[in-house]
From Swiss-Prot:
Site (Stabilizes the transition state in the phosphoryl transfer from HPr to EIIA) residue list: R540
PTS EIIB type-2 domain span: 379-475
GO molecular function: kinase activity; protein-N(PI)-phosphohistidine-mannitol phosphotransferase system transmembrane transporter activity; protein-phosphocysteine-sugar phosphotransferase activity
This protein's name: PTS system mannitol-specific EIICBA component
Comment block on domains: The EIIC type-2 domain forms the PTS system translocation channel and contains the specific substrate-binding site. The PTS EIIB type-2 domain is phosphorylated by phospho-EIIA on a cysteinyl residue. Then, it transfers the phosphoryl group to the sugar substrate concomitantly with the sugar uptake processed by the PTS EIIC type-2 domain.
Residue ranges of domain PTS EIIC type-2 in the record: 12-343
Function of the molecule: The phosphoenolpyruvate-dependent sugar phosphotransferase system (sugar PTS), a major carbohydrate active transport system, catalyzes the phosphorylation of incoming sugar substrates concomitantly with their translocation across the cell membrane. This system is involved in D-mannitol transport.
Induction: Induced by mannitol. Repressed by MltR.
High-level lineage: Bacteria, Pseudomonadati, Pseudomonadota, Gammaproteobacteria, Enterobacterales
């Protein structure tokens, strides 16, 4: 498979995952109700069992279509997708999950192109009329199309897939689906198979039989743990600590990406994964195991929670035996590899780069020093993975703890999905090497580092050392701001200083426009900006709300208004009664911080502000205090 095609398939999997994952809690809730109240459940109840059918028939497809439309064109796309999928639901007799994955995005695209075409053609004063009626009309039209065409087509496709699956089961071929699934997982293509095929088939099967084997095919942690355990016994000593962590994360955290790098270091281990998975599927078929809903993440805890009454032994047996098969095969393959890497007539083993994982440690050290500009100040680091919820979250947590132990408080470490990486405001992006090309396409301005393993402890140690040496040297050109009061003053080179004159407590306003004008006026009065910057701040707010969440808003000017900025500075305003700053009624800001930053100085300024306000207790204190010195103290306490 070519690289561009691989990226396309990964993107498709990411999009399917983005439709399913936000709604996974609903499927879990449905599984809990099913496990409790169906005839074979823990507390059989025919009355409460009646809620299962409406949820699976109506709620699942509508939620998925809503999410799919929202991903393409926000709320308007979500509404059209939700309306349209009803047509497909009532035209068929099967759960319309696959149809929802198609109809939802179609609704989003239709509204997107309609909005694009009509953007400058609606007369002033008719915007609300056009917006409301266009969504209703487009939704009705797509509903008719779904009812007449898309629904019946999806039903035929589902019947065909069901026929193929039954054919495989009757001919004892279903276990061999592992030949496709296990290699696909290693190359981050599992979301396409899992959410595009196995998940819809699983829901259809559960409706009929109150359980499905398809929910346990991809989520079975046994084969992956088998590979990790084999590495633990036959790998080199200095990776055993990370392997212990990987095994715990794989088993209880359900993050399967953890074992991918260990397989890629010795691709022959894919055979162990395949054989382990085949064994597990075979046991589930013979003993009729399965789950009542999706186990997400693929943790042993999730699997046990979604196991129907009476099937605990069967499901655990399938997981354990698949682990043993994978472990034994992996041990044999690693022993063969070790034997092949001994020098003939000597007891000295040659540790080749393409075999031992610890050989990647030295590569990481060299990579960090050669890839990063020693004069660049790194303040915002993002770990990215395909979905942004598994391995990247683990990696971000590891680095965050390390830099915290080193008393580094002015660097932000976060995680994100590849396709959610912002195209500005990021200094360093770290990904698995198979995803680095996609990350570079999302943001070509930031520095990029590639990892073989997200549990490579040596990498984090070297990166932490680099950050200390290059970002915290007193002689380096750190872009920062200090907090000045009688007891606190930083002698470092600063972008600006926060003083009592920048802080306004107990303010009252009737609208966010009034707030922005007040802040803009203070920026002008204190010599930070020219008069024109006030209108630029209002213009920027019309483009998109500067509401950040957690009671905070950060109004600033447009990119074009940088010529109106004289000096970098902020104005801190407190509104105890709150001001509506976002699009939703709940988006109330109590802390409004106006920003004016020259050149690229907005990046460290915003990063530092968000670092300070990353604690709910700090936000609460700043929202109610009546003493300016309290604000100065809370800012200075964060060592900014």
């Amino acid at each position: 498979m070519s690289v561009p095609m691989t990226v396309k398939v990964q993107n498709l999997g990411r999009f399917l995952s983005a439709m399913i994952m936000p709604n996974i809690s609903v499927f879990i809730a449905w599984g809990i109700i099913s496990g409790l109240f169906i005839k074979s459940g823990w507390c059989p109840n025919q009355t409460l069992e009646k809620v299962l059918s409406p949820i699976s028939v109506y709620l699942f497809p509508i939620l998925i279509a809503n999410t799919g439309g929202y991903l393409i064109n926000g709320k308007r796309g979500a509404i059209v997708g939700s309306i349209a999928v009803v047509g497909a639901i009532i035209s068929t007799a099967i759960p319309m999950l696959l149809g929802a994955m198609i109809i939802g995005p179609i609704g989003g695209w239709i509204t997107y192109y309609f909005d694009k075409i009509s953007k400058y053609k609606v007369k002033s004063g008719f915007e609300m009329l056009v917006n409301n009626f266009s969504v209703g009309i487009l939704g009705v039209l797509l509903l008719f199309i779904s009812f007449l065409c898309i629904g019946p087509m999806i039903e035929k496709l589902s019947c065909f897939l069901g026929y193929v699956v039954n054919l495989m089961i009757n001919n004892h071929l279903l276990p061999f689906i592992a030949i496709l699934i296990e290699p696909a997982k290693i190359f981050f293509l599992n979301n396409v198979i899992n959410h595009g095929v196995l998940f819809p088939l699983g829901i259809q099967e559960v409706v009929k039989f109150n359980k499905s084997i398809f929910f346990l095919i991809e989520s079975n942690p046994g084969p992956g743990i088998g590979v990790l355990m084999a590495w633990f016994f036959f790998g080199c000593d200095n990776i055993k600590k990370s392997l212990k962590e990987a095994i715990v994360i794989q088993l209880f955290g359900g993050i399967h990406e953890i074992y991918f790098p260990y397989v890629l270091k010795n691709p022959r281990l894919i055979l162990a994964l395949i054989l382990g998975s085949i064994t597990g599927i075979f046991i589930l078929i013979v003993l009729r195991g399965g789950l009542i809903s999706a186990a997400s993440p693929g943790s042993i805890i999730s699997i046990l929670a979604m196991t129907p009454k009476g099937l605990y032994v069967i499901n655990l047996l399938a997981i354990i035996i698949s682990f043993l098969v994978s472990f034994l095969v992996s041990c044999m393959l690693l022993k063969i590899s070790n034997r092949n890497h001994y020098v003939k007539g000597s007891n000295t083993k040659i540790e080749k780069d393409n075999f031992l994982i610890n050989s990647s440690f030295q590569k990481n050290r060299t990579c960090i020093k050669s890839s990063l500009d020693s004069h660049k100040c790194i303040r915002n680091i993002i770990f990215a993975c395909d979905a942004g919820m598994g391995s990247s979250a683990v990696a971000a947590g590891i680095l965050r703890n390390k830099i915290h132990d080193l008393n580094i408080f002015n660097i932000t470490v976060s995680n994100a999905a590849i396709d959610s990486i912002p195209n500005f405001g990021v200094d360093l992006i770290i990904t698995h090497y198979s995803l680095t090309d996609r990350a570079r396409k999302r943001n070509s301005n930031a520095k990029h580092l590639s990892l073989n393993s997200f549990l490579d402890n040596a990498f984090y140690n070297e990166l932490s050392k680099y950050l200390v040496e290059n970002n915290l040297d007193n002689n380096s050109s750190i872009l920062d701001f200090s907090v000045r009061n009688q007891n606190n003053f930083s002698s470092k080179k600063n972008v600006f200083s926060l003083t009592k004159e920048n802080i306004f407590l107990g303010q009252i306003a009737s609208s966010k426009e009034e707030v922005i004008r007040f802040i803009g006026r203070q920026l002008v009065n204190q010599g930070y900006v020219k008069e024109e910057y006030i209108e630029a701040m209002l213009e920027r707010e019309k483009m998109m709300s500067t509401w950040l969440g957690e009671s905070i808003a950060l109004p600033h000017g447009t990119i074009q208004s940088k010529d109106f900025i004289l000096n970098t500075g902020i104005i801190f305003c407190q509104f105890p009664n709150g001001i509506l700053f976002g699009d939703d009624p709940e988006d109330i800001a109590h802390l409004v911080i106006g920003v004016a930053a020259r050149n690229n100085e907005h990046i460290p300024v915003v990063s530092n502000i968000t670092n300070i306000l990353d604690n709910n207790d700090v936000i609460k204190s700043l929202s109610i205090t009546k003493n300016i010195d309290d604000v100065l103290y809370l800012f200075s306490r964060k060592n900014i």
